[in-house]
Amino acid sequence: VRHSPWKVASLLFCSGFCALIYQTVWLRQFRLIFGASTFATGAVLAIFMAGLGIGSALLGKRADAKERPLAYYALLEFFIAVAAALSPLLLWVAARIYFASGGSPDLGIAVATLLRLFLALLVLGPATFLMGGTLPAAARAVETNDDSGRRGVALLYGVNTLGAVAGALLSTFVMLETFGNRRTLFIAVLVNLIVAVIARSMARVSPASSRPEDFEDTGTGWKPAVLDRPVYIASSLVGFAFLLMELVWYRMLSPVLGGTTYMFGLILAIALLGIGLGGAAYSLFRRGPATPGGFAITCSLEALAIAFPFALGDRLAILANVLRDLGAVGGFGGHVLSWTIVTVIVVFPAAFIAGIQFPLLIALLGRGRENVGRQIGAAYAWNTGGAIAGSLAGGFGLIPLLSAPSTWRLVAVLLALLAFAAVLVAARARQHAFATATIIIGIAAIAATFAPGPTAVWRHSGIGAARAPKPKTRNELLEFLHNTRRIIAWERDGRESSVAIAALDDTAFVVNGKSDGAARHDAPTQVMAGLLGGIFHPQPKTALVVGLGTGSTVGWMAAIPSMERVDAIELEPVVLDVARMCEPVSADAMKNPVVKVTIADAREVLLTTDKKYDIISSEPSNPYRAGIASLFTREFYEASADRLNPGGYLVQWVQAYQIHAGTMQTIYGTVTSVFPHVLTWWTSPGDLVLVASREPIVMDVSQLRRRIAQEPFRSGLHNSWRVESAEQFVARVAANEDFARAAAKEAPAINTDDRTVIEFGFARSIDAAATVLGQIMLTAHNMKMNAPVGLRGDLDWKAVDANRVWSLRRAPADNPPNLAVMATKTLEMAKNGDVRAEVFAAILRQREPLESDVILATLRSRQNRQDEAAELLRGALVAYRTNPWPDPDVMFSGVELAMNVGRGSPQRARMLYDAMSQPFAVMLQENYRRQVLIELASMVDRCGPQTLAAIRAVEPHPYWTRDMLELRAECYARNGLEDLAERALEDLATFDANTPAPIITPQSPPTPRGSS
């Protein structure tokens, strides 16, 4: 008597639910031990999948020999639950062993990887080995010999995978945030035990027969269409392709969906949903035995399903940008819906076809119950082996070597070629069904890979981080597309991330679609994250910095005279190239022998090293990104405290944007649970830096004045903050230690390794306009909690308050309290022709000669003394090539002024053209500089060599304004560049076609009534 397939399938649903939760929790837990590097994650995934594959192969054979396979299944589920319940203890043992070993910094990558494999095997081996045997055992319990297509196997496979979908969604969106890792794991253990009990009960009531007569020939004369070995190889290849493609999906969807834990869970859930529904569809609709031709067409269809979203390219990115508005309507649920729509388009079709493939391969091996356990086990083992190879090949080789888009192309071509090979096998077996369709679809898939595919608009525009503009018209959209593609100066796919340099108005390095720092505009945070701890510590000798980035934090910290060693911990090797490009603002960090860069995970380093530091500065990426929140946990701060010398400081960056008050309270609560004394500084309108210590933070005013007058503090404070005095420095204190403790008392939770609540809090507010800087400063001011508790000595508090008032209002003051306000105020005077600007410009010249020149040039231009203005401006523009520290607003005004001063005089235009012909330091104002350069060139030689060179320098992404497009078309036509002229005219026609027609044409005004 066979068991009801649907009853057994319900058990498999719960089994899949538990297995996915186990996998999710174990990966998160191992990330806390080994770190989040590709090497570490790859080792854990390899053991997890290898355990499944080996267990499937070995236990599948045993399932065929069992008289009561459902009882065998129940036993497997029981011991899986036991092994999972023991895993927290085994993880603790693994952590102690790994931390004692010194990790990858001491052992090296090769030895550390071997140790990770061993420890992962210790923790995961028993459970995953047993998991591998569950599907063969369950299939043995439901299959009958009259099931020629093995639809029962497909049903179990599909429903098991749908259970995994439920596990992925519930764990990601509910359980991990609510219960934490450990309790989520034990909930799954409880469900697993219930499954074991129910399965055992079902086995007692209705045992399946395994007698020899069950395998007697039914008289149909059926023989396998192909030998076993080709089927196993095919199973391996599709496993390789799908896992490789899964890595590409994660890498490519992160820029448009945000890279949060929610995104990764959603991609996994959609992929599993497709597989599950594909398996169920095979079970419900497949009639008759499987054929090689059927497998061939699934491969070609999967290739097309993968290639089609690639061919859509930036259209999908634009769709994702448009769908962001769903978040404004439906809140977080609207965001999830928008992510789901994009993910379904990209992932679901290929996953659905992959779900059909596996049961089809099982059906190619045999029919009914005969050897079903062994064949499922072997096919699954080969499939898992291919998946392991695909995962390792993608993470360690193909994506960094070829880039993610090229790997996307490769997967589609590989599947198309596999389809063609399957057609040949089918032809030899004289099975010609689907051959023509397979070839046509496969060729279409390969053809689709020749499309441009995703460009910088998809990969680097910040759509997922809510940084991309939302165009309202067709021309605004085209302007966005051209601008985004034009400003990307450099890009690489690294081992861990995709990295690019966006040269809009600065050297901004973009990681997985979001800017993680700009050389000049983020210098107020990056430089001072390196210097704040050094200002308070009397003689810092050793420091550790989490995250290399532009190198500014590391470089300025290393410039402190007493500093002997600065260890910079960076996860992505490609970022070292970024740091080298930013040396003009980083005090030549990468050339300083004091700086030692380690490519590793920061948690791993802190937990395995025995070094002690005077300062630890942590400036990772945003906590909403998967895995980053573990650098903001109580355990991370405890490890930091253990690594600090007495009197040492932790300097922690916190974003002040896209954050709600509850999340900020949690951060305060977490930091103060380890460091009772926390001083909050505002470094820029969007950034906070917490200076934390186990001892009271003492700020002696006389010592402070001496300290900030010394180098590198004097230059660092001036360049980044425009701070010249102790009063201006203290004005940067947003809140004192009492405020931090008061906020901590209201924290809704503590961010821990087990429950990283800020990860989810930040992810829910990723598209929010919420900021906390103003709230913190106003509340601290009203509660008199904005003066450092440990302040000793006299300060001019009126000057402190004047600086704070300006910082909150962001408006020029009548009596400028600092150089930044003075520059803004004086520039405004110059633009209005106010001669008082000369007096302030003379004062500014002592510390800000470039700002002074630009302001005077502005005044002279306003006074119609254009030759004097041009000369002053020329000097400033040439100096900008090597000086990265000008005031950004004044600099922009100077570049804009060059265009106005150059008009009417080819000589002035040529002078300014020559001054702007080279990029400024760290590519400041690069996009605008190139645009103004075209304008100046046209004033010099209207479509001559200079104009032509300036226009061609931005091809094929012109500035999308009518004047620029018209000039471009004219110059190409006049120089006989027919192909370029034709394209330029097409672009101009497109611009005009998308420009609304005026109600009244300006060239033809109507005749007034009554005129003759």
Regions found by a protein language model. Give the residues of each.
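Alpha-helical transmembrane segments of multi-pass membrane proteins
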Residues: 1-706, 710-713, 762-768
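SAM/dcSAM-binding transferase cores
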Residues: 701-805
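Alpha-helical repeat scaffolds
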Residues: 807-811, 834-845, 867-880, 905-920, ...
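"A position-specific structural signal for the A-helix of alpha-solenoid helical repeats
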Residues: 821-824, 855, 893-896, 930-935, ...
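Residue at a conserved register position within TPR or TPR-like alpha-solenoid repeats
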Residues: 829, 860, 898-901, 937-940, ...
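Boundary/linker segments of alpha-helical solenoid repeat arrays
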Residues: 850-855, 880-891, 920-931, 956-965, ...
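Terminal, low-structured helical/coil segments at or just beyond the last alpha-helical repeat
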Residues: 967, 971-974, 978-1012
